[in-house]
From Swiss-Prot:
Residues 2-146 form the Globin domain. This is Hemoglobin subunit beta-2. The gene is hbb2. GO terms for biological process: hydrogen peroxide catabolic process; oxygen transport. One of its GO terms (cellular component) is blood microparticle. It comes from Pseudaphritis urvillii (Congolli). Heme b binds at residues 63, 92.
Amino acid sequence: VEWTDFERATIKDIFSKIEYEVVGPAALARCLVVYPWTQRYFGKFGNLYNAEAITGNPMISKHGTTILHGLDRAVKNMDDIKNTYAELSVLHSETLHVDPDNFKLLSDCLTIVVAGQLGKDFTGEVQAAFQKFLAVVVSSLGRQYH
């Protein structure tokens, strides 16, 4: 993947501005509410009966924050995202058996939450760079499935 200077700067800027403990949990909770079939991977997380239970679940919050911090690895290794996530791809495909389409669903929810947090600063150009970044991450996480 080729990154422009604008894209690199934009991705770093986004991750320097967002609140991980807010955005991560909100994105994961949104994914679980909007796409309820994704809840099957979180059976050990307790009550996911409705939106209120999901958004108030401390395990969902913690995992959402963990996911967002996991994206830091891609931000720091933008030229080698595929290898950066090689082990995580194996874990999700061979151990957790996560449907790789769910990575895209989560990335869409993350885009919505980040847009809400950044407001007018989340221009079309910024969104394009962010979605390109997330598409590379999603592809890398799904790599083991191919």
